[in-house]
Amino acid sequence: MAGKITVVGLGAGDMDQLTIGIHKLLTKADTLYVRTKDHPLIEELEKETKNIRFFDDIYEKHDQFEAVYEEIADILFEAARREDVVYAVPGHPFVAEKTVQLLTERQEKENVQVKVAGGQSFLDATFNVLQIDPIEGFQFVDAGTLSADELELRHHLIICQVYDQMTASEVKLTLMEKLPDDYEVVIVTAAGSRGEEIRTVPLFELDRNVALNNLTSVYIPPIKEEKLLYHEFSTFRSIIRELRGPNGCPWDKKQTHQSLKQYMIEECYELLEAIDEEDTDHMIEELGDVLLQVLLHAQIGEDEGYFTIDDVIKGISEKMVRRHPHVFKDVKVQDENDVLANWEDIKKAEKNTSESSLLDSVPKTLPALSKAAKLQKKAAKVGFDWEDVSDIWEKVSEEMKEFSSEVSEAPHEHNLKAEFGDILFALVNVARFYKIEPEEALTMTNDKFRRRFSYIEETAKEEGVELADMSLEDMDKLWNEAKETERRS
C-alpha cells in the first residue's frame, strides 16, 4: 500500500496508562495528528512532541459532525501518501470514534494501511468508578443519536459525548419519554483521570448548573421498579404471557381464538365510540383494550406453537413497506388516488389470483351496511355501477314499491326480509354516490335517537311522570323540544 496511518488511543487521561511503545509513537512522530485538544494528556504531550496538528478548527467549519469526520479522514489519507502518519484519539480508537471507523472502511479504496495501536477505553474507568459489571447487561450510546425507542432500561446505560448544555437538554427530554422526572442519573466527567468528577442528580436537573465537556458521559442505572416499565411493549407482553402461564388466571388460560371473537368486536366498537366522542383519555383506554385482544390472540398462537406476536409485527411491517413503494422505493405518485390504485394492484398481486371472485376480498364478517358498501365499491371498479344518481333514486323507489306490494299481500317472513334488504342495499348505493359511510351515518342517527329519548326520560322523571303513562303526543312534544335544543346548541 502507498502509505500507513497508525491510530493511537490516548486512554482515559493519565500518562501512566500509556505503554512505553505507545508513548514512543506519540512523542517520536514528525507530526502528531490529534483529533481534539480537549483531553487531559495534551498539555504533557505538547511538551514532549515536536509538532502537533489538532483538528479542532475543522469542527468550527461545519454544522454537522459527519462532515467534520469526513474532512479529518481526507486530510489523514492525503498526509499518509507523503509520510507515515500517527493519529491520536481520546480513549480507545474503536470506542465512540467515527473517524477511526471511516479510516478502516476506506483504507483499501485509498490504498493506505490503517493500523490501530490500542489505548485504554474510558469505559474501563467508567465501569470502575461506577462500580458496575457490564455482564449484567450494558448499553452504550452516543448522545447525538439517542433515540427513546432504542433504550433498554433494564440494563446499565451509558450515554457518551454529552459535551454541552444543549446536548444535555436533548438527552434529558429523550429520557423523560421513558423515565420519571426525578429518576436519579449520574454525570461522569474525565473518568480515570486526575480531573475525574462524579455527580448524581435527578433527571430534570441534568442540564442545570452542571459542568459539561467532551469527556462527560451520563449513566442511567437499570430500572428495578417494575411499574416504571409498564409503558414498555415487552413488559405488556410478559404480563399476558404470565396471565396464560401455569400460575396465571383461570379465565385467561381457558380462552381460545373463537371465544375471544366477541370481545374483539366489542372493544373495537367501544374504540369507535371514543373516537366519535373525541375523548383522548377514553381513546387511550380503548386502544389498550384492543391491543389486549391482539396480544391474547398472539399468546394463544405462541402457546399452541403456530405463531407469535413477532410474526404478526413482521407480517404487517413487510406489508406496509411492500404497499408503499412511493415511500420506501423509487415509485412516483401524484396524489392519494395514485396511492390507492397502487395499493389495489399490489394487493391483487399478493393474492396471486387465488380468489375466484372480485368480491372474495370483502370479509364475510363485516357489519352488513359496511359490507354492502364494499361490495358495491368493488363491483363499481369494473363498471358495474349507476352513471347518474337519479337512476339510483329510481332504484330506491322501485324497491320501496316491491316491499309495499309484499306487505299488502299475505306477507312471508323470508320475502319481507329480502325486499327490505333490497331497500337498504339501494340506499347504501345512494350513500356511496354522496361519499357517505353508511355505518357511520346510521351510528350518528342511533346516537341522536339515544340523546333525544334520554331527554324525554329525564324530563318525565323531573315532572314525576312514568313514561308508560305518557301519551305519544306528549312524548313527541318533548322529542321536538330536544330537537330544538340541539339545533340551538
Swiss-Prot record:
Q: Which Gene Ontology BP terms does the record give? A: dATP catabolic process; dGTP catabolic process; dTTP catabolic process; dUTP catabolic process; TTP catabolic process; UTP catabolic process
State the NCBIfam families in the record: mazG, PRK09562.1
Q: What is this protein called?
A: Uncharacterized protein YabN
Question: Organism's domain of life?
Answer: Bacteria
Tell me which PANTHER family the record gives. Answer: NUCLEOSIDE TRIPHOSPHATE PYROPHOSPHOHYDROLASE (PTHR30522:SF0)
The Gene Ontology terms for molecular function here are: methyltransferase activity; nucleoside triphosphate diphosphatase activity
Pfam families the record matches: MazG, TP_methylase
